[in-house]
Amino acid sequence: TGGNVEMSGSVTGNDTGIALTGAQIHAGAGKVALTGVSSSGKGIVVDSATTVDTRSVDLRTDTIDLQGTITGDGDSDGSVTVRTFTGDRIINFGTGSGGLDLAGNTFSSAGKIQGFKKNIVGDAAKKSNIKAGGVTADNNLVLSSAAGKITVSGAVTVAAGHGLTLASKDSVEGAGVITADAVNLDAADAVVRLTGTHAIQKLDGKAKELAFKNSADLVVGGETGLTIGAGGANIAVTAGDLT
């Protein structure tokens, strides 16, 4: 009914690390943290009869089956993080299988996680390779791969009024198209080559090297600045102004 909720489970074989079956968790302004590990089965299973209401949530697992709903309270400080338990794993977001697999609409009104002002996939302190395509998000979205690679293989669409942060110490690449009000690069040590023709309004952050193309007016560095390393930058717009 309120406060923080923490659960963890670790099993071998095909059993489930944490299974929420018909559970009703109401944490109010608190945080729900679930850590589930299974050597061959699912780390975390949330069945369709389960509902979780909370301000913040942290799901830490290498495999997940998410059928129930996890709902934020809409507070400006609220966030949800979905990240791997083990380092050097793959996160498939909207495309692919065989890793920590998330539906592309996970953070939208049509998905299972709703109402959080910040939606984070990955962990800034633990390497993962993130592949994203066919993704829609209703609020701010962060992809964070630490020393791993982010591949934008298909469309990544963030609702109007919100932005996408790409955080990597390795590389950010792909031909998928990003649609968002803003893109922020947390990639001072990474080569960023995004070859799709994107539909954003603002580009800020840091990258070691940058290639980026936009389909309309683009303001570069207007919010927090844009710092590019020795690799230089190639930024173009196919229509409109670059300022």
Tell where the protein language model's regions lie, with residue ranges:
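Extracellular lectin-like interaction modules
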Residues: 1-243
